[in-house]
Amino acid sequence: MRTELMTRLSELESAPTMDGMAWADLGRRAIGASAAEIEAVRTALVARLEGTEGAARARLELGEALGHLGDPRLCGPGEAAYWVDVTLDDGASLQVGRFHVTNAEMRQFVASGAYADEAHWSDGGLLWRDGATDWATLASPAEAAPFTVPNQPVVGASWWEAEAYAKAHGARLLSLAEHRGLVRGAEKRPYPWGSPFREGYAHTREEALGRPAAVGLYRMDRTPEGLFDLAGNVATWLGDEVGAQRIIHPGSWARPSMASWAKALDMVDAGTRSADLGFRLVRER
């Protein structure tokens, strides 16, 4: 017998245009449904997310609905699909995380006990950790919920936490030169898609969404190799140290589009926690 949920799914799939809010509502209604129904809705949501149709806010909510259902695009650093092979202009041969590290990954890092394992922390990180509240505690209150959807990039992590996560997975943080090289490519692009900056191509303050989006939601913010969100969504901790400060690429949902171009940079204290600052992994291949 066909359920109301499946009937609604069929209606939306056959509609001439995509109603993003309706799709997001369908995703929310699927929570608690049968395994077969969840899988059908999840597959349909991924198909819409991987397109470009729909208003920004509707797509934001669609991505969050997928995150709560279980986003099949996500995997961990131990899986080959997590990484994208890239060769930079200087000949460096790298494997780079397709997306920023997500909330789902960070939750697993904490739940597995790896966050508490001192072997993953540098001496500076241990000194910082002794006086700091851990990420999971800060991410637990109800008011943090809009920023802790599983398929959103993790935010609110300090540089020390990002460093520890990377070390635990046999990786490190990108350098400023590497981040620029990934965005610019051999063509010396100012943005992952080329030039000029275009409205709706990256998740910057102009989108007026007020929080991070699911990773990979902005389909144009993508390099030819398949790296997502290098211009916007969340700013990126980089490995470069300047005394007590660390360099970041500042392009994010909370900053204007001028912060998203390849050569943009900022410096913040290593202990900074911000709702628009995340990180991405890299390793040599």
PLM features: residue spans?
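Alpha-helical scaffold domains
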Residues: L5-P16
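HEAT-repeat alpha-solenoid elements in large eukaryotic scaffold proteins
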Residues: T17-A24
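Short capping motifs at secondary-structure boundaries
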Residues: L26-E37, V41, V101, F109-E118, ...
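Long amphipathic alpha-helical scaffold segments
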Residues: E37-Y82
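Non-transmembrane alpha-helical segments in soluble domains
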Residues: V46, G63, G67, N103-A111, ...
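A short glycine-rich, aromatic-capped structural motif
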Residues: R73-T137, P150-E161, L182, G232
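Functional-site microenvironments in short loops/helix caps that host divalent-cation chemistry
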Residues: L138-D266, A270, A275
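Short, structured beta-strand segments at or near domain termini in extracellular proteins/domains
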Residues: D276-R285
